[in-house]
């Protein structure tokens, strides 16, 4: 298993922390001299990945063992034609997030951008991306939103709802919610 962490802001602090806390782990740090945005950063890091697919995780989420169990089960059933599969959270299982609108909805079995007529789903910060598909984008600085919108237009963006609780920790409110969890 390869673990790659994109770094830019405070990269020396992160590099030293990883080196000191996880010396026995094979963690590759992929430095972005210039910010490449979400998809561009993963595309840049993909040179370190030998697999066809990458599991991409955002760092502002507290990942529980149950979250990972659900994601790993989904990886086992992944089909080779998958371009991108998002892991989504229903609002009833989302903690530490105050968004009025969701990120996505499922309409007639298809994933689309949030539609207030359907239950709101949040992007969990986890996705599986085909690296060959990602590399087909000629840009080097670009967001996953571009990929998602392209795939939505083609009815090819996949999504799976994670049933376990999910904790967003991108601000102090979210951090305070999870500080006492095991």
Question: How should each PLM-predicted stretch be described?
Answer:
Residues 1-58, 136-139:
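Conserved N-terminal catalytic core of the sugar/cofactor nucleotidyltransferase
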Residues 5, 56, 84-87, 159:
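Structural beta-sheet core signal
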Residues 8, 30-32, 87-89, 114, ...:
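Conserved beta-strand termini and adjacent loop/short-helix elements that scaffold enzyme active sites
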Residues 9, 85-103:
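Short beta-strand-to-loop element that shapes/binds the nucleotide-sugar donor at the catalytic cleft/hinge
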Residues 20-24, 46-48, 73-74, 101-107, ...:
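Short, hinge-like loop/turn segments at secondary-structure boundaries
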Residues 51, 80-83:
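Short, high-confidence coil segments that cap the C-terminus of an alpha-helix
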Residues 55-57, 62, 68-78, 92-96, ...:
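Catalytic-core segments of class I nucleotidyltransferases/pyrophosphorylases
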């Amino acid at each position: 298993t390869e673990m790659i962490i994109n770094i830019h802001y405070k990269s020396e602090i992160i590099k030293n922390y990883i080196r000191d806390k996880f010396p026995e782990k094979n963690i590759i740090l992929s430095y972005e001299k210039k910010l490449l945005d979400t998809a561009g950063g993963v595309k840049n890091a993909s040179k370190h990945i030998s697999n066809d697919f990458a599991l991409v995780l955002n760092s502002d989420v507290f990942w529980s063992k149950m979250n990972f169990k659900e994601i790993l089960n989904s990886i086992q059933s992944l089909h080779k034609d998958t371009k991108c599969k998002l892991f989504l959270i229903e609002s009833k299982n989302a903690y530490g997030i105050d968004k009025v609108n969701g990120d996505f909805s499922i309409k007639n079995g298809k994933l689309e951008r949030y539609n207030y007529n359907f239950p709101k789903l949040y992007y969990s910060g986890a996705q599986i991306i085909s690296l060959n598909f990602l590399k087909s984008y000629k840009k080097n600085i670009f967001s996953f939103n571009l990929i998602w919108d392209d795939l939505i237009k083609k009815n090819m963006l996949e999504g799976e709802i994670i049933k376990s609780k999910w904790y967003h920790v991108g601000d102090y409110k979210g951090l305070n919610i999870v500080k006492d969890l095991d």
